[in-house]
Amino acid sequence: MTTETEEIDMLQIQDTLVSLDLLERHFLCDLSKCKGQCCIDGDAGAPITEDERRKIEEILPEIIDDLSPAAQREIRENGVAYVDEEGDLVTQLVNGCQCVFTVFEPDGMCHCAIEKAWRAGRVDFMKPVSCHLYPVRLTEYPSFTAVNLHRWKICKCAEVLGRQKGVRAYEFLRGPLTRRFGEEWYEELAATAEEYFRQYPPED
């Protein structure tokens, strides 16, 4: 269902309010172009929960040797996470910008050390939900969760590729959205998107 406003800009799905950008914007990560730059640019780490911090600390012995010397030193001195200026718990950074769990391939592409270890079967934790969800950002309120699409210039290539392939953000993010909210929630979102586009046919 939609919120009761003269101009629709949010959709209500269960106890969440979802930005229409998630439906209308095209998005498909193009790692060949961006090289995983979202892991190394920014002024704060990735938001995590206390449970995720504990899980990262639990698997740290398995991945610590995969990290750069600077990242290992930062973790030893300051831990895997810190509270940023907005009061959010976030992953630790190297040099104030690069996530400590970033690893680089010979071609310069960035990957998440946690996810690499998970894909290799070495750990049972994929990566923080906020990383999996990106470019979606969640804001928790007492009675609902706001689901917004963060637009960043380094992701322009993902918007271009998504448009070329006809993939919208909510479709690209089916896996992480289902991980966070559940299959029933995602199916309701997809059905709502179908009805929305029936009423308001996209121009693209």
What are these regions (language model features)?
Residues 2-204:
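Short loop/turn segments that flank or connect secondary-structure elements
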